[in-house]
From Swiss-Prot:
Protein name as it appears in the record: Deleted in esophageal cancer 1
GO BP, sorted A to Z: negative regulation of cell population proliferation
Function: Candidate tumor suppressor.
One Pfam match: DEC1
Biological source species: Homo sapiens (Human)
Tissue: Expressed in many tissues, with highest expression in prostate and testis. Reduced expression in esophageal carcinomas.
Keyword field: Tumor suppressor
InterPro entries documented for this protein: DEC1 (IPR031718)
Amino acid sequence: MTMNVLEAGKWKSIVPAPGEGLLAVLHMMVFTDALHRERSVKWQAGVCYNGGKDFAVSLARPKAAEGIAD
């Protein structure tokens, strides 16, 4: 499974690390739930590099992500 994430203003396709597929499923469930309820729930996906080829995919609401980045 691949995910498209926005990093440094550019979209990248990544392959989640084992176990990270659950986050993708959670993201799709939240998006689908928002469509069914006719409201918008925005989430921001980010990649956290641990050095080398290791990384993790994280999901956060944009306001929370801004607080972390500051």
